[in-house]
Amino acid sequence: MISLDNLTVSYGGWTLFDNISLLINPKDRIGLVGKNGAGKTTLLRLIVGEQQPTSGSISYNGECTIGYLPQQMRVADTTTLVEETAKAFDEVLKLEAEIARLTREIAERTDYESSDYELLLHRLNEATDHYHILGGDTREADIEKTLLGLGFKRSDFQRATSEFSGGWRMRIELAKLLLRRPSIFLLDEPTNHLDIESIQWLEDYLKNYNGAVLLISHDRAFLDNVTTRTVEISLGKAYDYKVPYSRYVVLRAERRAQQMAAYENQQRMIEKTEEFIEKFRYKPTKSNQVQSRIKQLDRLERIEVEEEDLATLNIKFPPAPRSGQIVAEIKEAGMSFGSKHVFSGANFTIERGDKIALVGRNGEGKTTLARMIVGQLTPTEGSIRVGANVNIGYYAQNQEDLMNGDFTVYDTLDRVAVGDVRTRLRDILGAFLFRGEDIDKKVKVLSGGERARLAMARLMLEPYNLLILDEPTNHMDMRSKDILKNAIMKYDGTVIVVSHDREFLDGMVSKVYEFRNGGVREYLGGIYYFLEKRKLESLQEVERKDAPAKEAAPKASSSGKLTYEQKKEQEKLLRKLRKAVETIEASLADLEKKIADYDRKFAEATQYNEADYKAYNELKAEYDHQMHEWEKASYELEITEGE
């Protein structure tokens, strides 16, 4: 269906891809993996035509259509949710008009035996078949099913898209993409803004999809459940494994062991050859042999091996100072923001050593409860009491903003590290993807993802006894997540984690608190015990179990009406937040254009220009910073407006 032939992508003197070839077949389910910066997103952009290779070619089956979901995109703000989603059927609407026109024309003809009449019938049949393939006759039901599957409520359908936060807007774009039914989906981190329920629904959708799927994800469970083939990008090459991710990990370890053996043998041969050359370089009787050995080294194809995996590093949190047995006591706690009721009736106790997951749809109150325990928010109902001698380490989405921008990456850790751990700072930074010259970068030039990883690395150096981690794995690759998970499992303190990553939570937590329909429910077991209890196997079951709650929920939140002044203040705040989001979006659009200009420039460049690359990296860092600000502003807007 799509053939990539000898693709090379070079930027000045640096080669990202070196003669990569790959064939994507109809109905393939491919997971694209590799270290951050290996070129996974670039490969998707090449396939979709947003970027051109330095050399090589990409060929497509004539009928191939592509549906591409990048990591960041924005939705128009001039329509309702349903109207925006229905844009997925633009081609269907054109077909409807063509079918109506052809039907009228055929009805008016009487030349039943003519070739023109036969041609009209043929075109009508083709248009009708295509209409059915694209789901034209079931589009309203498909829109509803897809939006519900991705976590929207029926009460959201007529809301303006401008009222939704950044994460929910990404879901709108994903819904449109799924409804277009292209020949192949190219999905870049599709689970980033989804909760566990929506991820499971998307898994089922993709497993049963009639086309091909090529996706990038750091969610191991998602990859295992969707893909049957894994392509690894490493050192400019593509390694194709006809197996799901977990099996690929085993085969990759075997391949790496073989590579290392070959690499070490070659290094020994090179060392002996260089010793011979140095020893006999100036002896006339050996000159022919010396020249022969020099040519041998020049012709030698050097074996490259990717840096050693860091997942085996034994990185630990410092021992937790002993706290009281009761770490936190939550009694009938609840939170509302103006007319927006988030949750109520939370009633549970967190004890020393507990490892707890907070799960549920976005906006149901997981982060709100975390901030209440930390003390950043005061409950509007009930109470929260933190126990004796509890020292909280809190990792949140904006935690990295608290770091000094003028410190280097290494200094940021060195200033809080004490004891023997100071000798291992480079290993710790490496575990969180900071290597080589990265450790000397100033914090202010780091991307949002890099700052988030640095904040987590710093958290691992300080002696807390209660860790509250809000989506800690968002900017991590598989190996970094494994390191963090192992460290948490060995940690002797108390842990509360907000996460939608099932593989990360599996085996790590022993209690799950689900935020749903304005309440909090406790499950005494791990994440898969919770999922089994909830039986989230299909959208039909989710709808059946939740139908009464969905009808009752509006009644519970409508008991307290706002005064005129309160409404006025809320509208004022909403205008301010929407303006902030619009301003940041305009800045992002400008930055995207400048970055795209540099991408084109580098693609055409024949010489390396250090000043251009410096400016390019500064633009990307600013883009990441602005995207982070956009996510924060969108979250505030979501909380204020309500879902």
Regions found by a protein language model. Give the residues of each.
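Intracellular alpha-helical coupling/juxtamembrane segments of multi-pass membrane proteins
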Residues: 251-276, 280-306
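ABC ATP-binding cassette signature C-motif
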Residues: 1-261, 312, 316-643
